């Protein structure tokens, strides 16, 4: 079946502006990170594997110095890894040569993290740290990419211990730089967890939308209606039509209102509204499009609509 009619040439973001979506530049968290800098041997940056090139905060590189750096691309189970070779090549062009794809929920590739950290630290000069036998690292990244999940996964694997950091599905769970957390006994490694810090300047509206779909920005700051529409656009662009079966559609759909109506009816998400008629006010039942958009976005985030690569 030819589906070229589904492919919009581009997505219309309307008059939206990126600056209206984001809180302040989270200077408090960044200031806390800087105070710990002299005690660090390595920076571990965690980012979402679905947006490996978008939204990484350049302030981290500018403010946290020339410490050894490891990029963890987490949530690999949700990403289309057929694009992995291209992504690694582009990251290398940007000067990022140490990259590990992980799934912290299933501990996939977690075993590689400590050996890579040890190698990076072993090959670097430890200014003001020569007398210390332990390795101290800081885990950084934008909100809700799995920083705390990585810490807990490392503790499960190397210490057989439980959670040291709270994990949540919304950005902003970790509010401050914590005290030292041990994640390995041999080699002896401690780390600092940090709050998610967004860049004060997002390069484009589309980059902001990608960040929103991955949950690094609170949904209401963007609008679930346009997020759902952009998600449908992306799924159709990548020929990822699992939503058709999931929501019981007959075929792929290009119109977000049609899709949301179907989702609302399938899930029983309706609401009563007052309509003014010639015989007076009448209560009518209509689909709850907001509830449908909410379900569509979260079903995608759980991986039930297939894997994607947003970059």
From Swiss-Prot:
What protein am I looking at?
A: Mitochondrial ribosome-associated GTPase 1
What's a Gene Ontology MF term here?
GTP binding
What are the residue boundaries of the CP-type G domain, all occurrences included? 27-200
User: Its membrane topology, per UniProt?
Assistant: Peripheral membrane protein
User: What is the top-level taxon of the source organism?
Assistant: Eukaryota
* Record-level GO cellular component terms: mitochondrial inner membrane; mitochondrial matrix; mitochondrial ribosome
The family classification in the record reads: Belongs to the TRAFAC class YlqF/YawG GTPase family. MTG1 subfamily.
UniProt keywords (A-Z) are:
GTP-binding, Membrane, Mitochondrion, Mitochondrion inner membrane, Nucleotide-binding, Transit peptide, Translation regulation
Q: Which residues bind GTP?
A: 74-77, 144-149, 196
| Record-linked PROSITE patterns | G_CP (PS51721)
Per the record, the major location class is mitochondrion
The subcellular localization recorded is:
Mitochondrion inner membrane
BP terms from Gene Ontology: regulation of translation
**PANTHER family of this UniProt entry?**
MITOCHONDRIAL RIBOSOME-ASSOCIATED GTPASE 1
- Membrane-crossing residues? none
What does this chain do? Plays a role in the regulation of the mitochondrial ribosome assembly and of translational activity. Displays mitochondrial GTPase activity.
In its keyword annotation, does this UniProt entry include Metal-binding?
no
Does the keyword section mention GTP-binding? yes
Q: Which organism is it from?
A: Xenopus tropicalis (Western clawed frog)
The beginning of the lineage is: Eukaryota, Metazoa, Chordata, Craniata, Vertebrata
Pfam families under this entry?
MMR_HSR1
């Amino acid at each position: 079946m030819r589906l070229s009619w589904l492919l919009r040439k581009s997505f219309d973001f309307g008059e939206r502006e990126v600056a209206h979506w984001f809180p302040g530049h989270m200077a408090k968290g960044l200031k806390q990170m800087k105070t710990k800098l002299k005690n660090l041997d390595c920076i571990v940056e965690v980012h979402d594997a679905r947006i490996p090139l978008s939204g990484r905060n350049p302030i981290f590189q500018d403010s946290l110095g020339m410490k050894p750096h490891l990029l963890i691309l987490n949530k690999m189970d949700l990403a289309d890894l057929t694009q992995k070779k291209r992504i690694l090549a582009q990251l290398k062009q940007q000067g990022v040569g140490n990259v590990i794809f992980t799934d912290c929920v299933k501990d996939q590739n977690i075993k590689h993290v400590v050996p890579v950290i040890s190698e990076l630290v072993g090959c670097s000069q430890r200014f003001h740290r020569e007398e210390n036998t332990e390795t101290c690292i800081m885990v950084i990244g934008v909100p809700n990419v799995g920083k705390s999940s990585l810490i807990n996964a490392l503790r499960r694997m190397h210490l057989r211990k439980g959670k040291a950091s709270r994990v949540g599905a919304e950005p902003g769970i970790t509010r401050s730089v914590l005290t030292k957390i041990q994640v390995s006994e041999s080699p002896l490694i401690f780390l600092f967890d940090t709050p998610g810090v967004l860049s004060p300047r997002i390069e484009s509206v589309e980059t902001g939308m990608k960040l929103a779909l991955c949950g690094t920005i609170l949904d209401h700051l963007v609008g679930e209606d346009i997020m759902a529409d952009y998600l449908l656009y992306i799924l159709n662009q990548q020929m990822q039509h699992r939503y058709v079966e999931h929501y019981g559609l007959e075929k792929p759909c290009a119109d977000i209102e049609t899709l949301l109506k179907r989702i609302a009816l399938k899930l029983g998400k309706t609401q009563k509204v007052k309509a003014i008629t010639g015989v007076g006010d009448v209560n009518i039942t209509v689909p709850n499009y907001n509830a449908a958009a909410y379900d569509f976005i979260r079903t995608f985030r759980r991986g039930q609509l297939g894997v994607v690569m947003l970059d």
